[in-house]
Design a protein with these regions (language model features):
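Non-catalytic, polymerase-adjacent accessory regions of viral genome-replication enzymes
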Residues: 1-38
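Short beta-edge/loop segments at beta->alpha junctions of small alpha/beta modules
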Residues: 4-10, 51-58
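Non-catalytic, well-ordered alpha-helical scaffold segments
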Residues: 7-10, 34, 38, 71, ...
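Short, conserved non-catalytic motifs in the polymerase core
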Residues: 19-27, 52-77, 93-105, 190, ...
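Amphipathic alpha-helical blocks
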Residues: 30-53
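Mid-sequence acidic-hydrophobic segments that form the walls
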Residues: 43, 80, 84-93, 117-121, ...
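Active-site-proximal segment of RNA-dependent polymerases
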Residues: 83-144
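Conserved polymerase palm-domain catalytic core
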Residues: 123-244
Length: 244
């Protein structure tokens, strides 16, 4: 048994548990925590891991409705494991003005950066400058999963030494074969298959297909709601960010 990997899974569990102590799925998982984590460990090392059913619902509290897929608690642990393994490397490559779901780079930080750039470009408001505002329609649902996986695998293979160096001191590193296996299982999992859809028909009636994973092209789209989806989307967009 690889006790370092098992310990890393336990740590991922404790990280996922933060802020979810009172949820039904977390409480159910915690009742059999040791057994559940050992079973997850066995599934991972024996290459039998498959993501479970997600719960799909519409987030209606915001001005714009969002389709959210809530992963099974077990799968959230795997998402955390993957995220913590690769995020330190890719965070170093992102441009300074990429703000989506990045620690310490929230809305206030973005506003301050925008103010800095406007003042710099306009020479402290003494000459005109322009701001380009655009949006990639249905971005999450247009991400090609085959391209995403190829990008991740190619970059990690070419920068494996940097990947190892980027890890915080004391953190266990997955070997490349296991990391690529987990990336493949998560990226190519179709969250729409056998998912549990919640919400009345009235709530869903006027939801635009362009904003739904159910209407994405084959092998395209990432579920909004997964921790890994946020990181993957930043990695996928990074080439465009660098070009801009």
């Amino acid at each position: 048994m690889n006790y370092d990997l098992l310990d890393t899974l336990f740590q991922a569990y404790f990280d996922v548990r933060k802020g979810k102590r009172n949820t039904v799925n977390q409480l159910r998982y915690e009742l059999n925590m040791e057994h559940e984590l050992l079973e997850l460990y066995d599934d991972i090392v024996s290459r039998r891991y498959n993501p479970s059913r997600s719960i799909c619902f519409l987030l209606t509290e915001l001005e714009i409705k969002r389709e959210i897929f809530g992963a099974n608690f077990r799968d959230r642990i795997v998402h955390r494991l993957i995220h913590d393994q690769i995020a330190p490397l890719f965070e170093r490559t992102f441009i300074a003005d990429s703000y989506s779901c990045r620690k310490g780079m929230g809305t206030l930080y973005a506003i301050r950066r925008l103010d800095h750039h406007i003042r710099s470009c306009s020479r402290n408001y003494s000459r005109p400058c322009w701001v380009l505002k655009l949006d990639v329609q249905g971005y999450f649902f247009s991400i090609d999963r085959k391209i995403l996986y190829a990008m991740l695998r190619s970059y990690l293979e070419r920068h494996w030494t940097a990947y190892c160096a980027a890890q915080p001191a004391g953190r266990y590193m997955l070997d490349s074969e296991l990391l690529f296996y987990l990336l493949e299982r998560v990226i190519f999992h179709d969250a729409t298959q056998n998912c549990i859809v919640r919400g009345s028909r009235k709530v869903w009636a006027d939801f635009p297909p362009s904003k739904s994973l159910f209407h994405a092209a084959p092998d395209c789209g990432l579920p909004i709601g997964n921790l890994t989806s946020q990181l993957f989307s930043n990695i996928y967009m990074d080439r465009f960010d660098q070009w801009m």
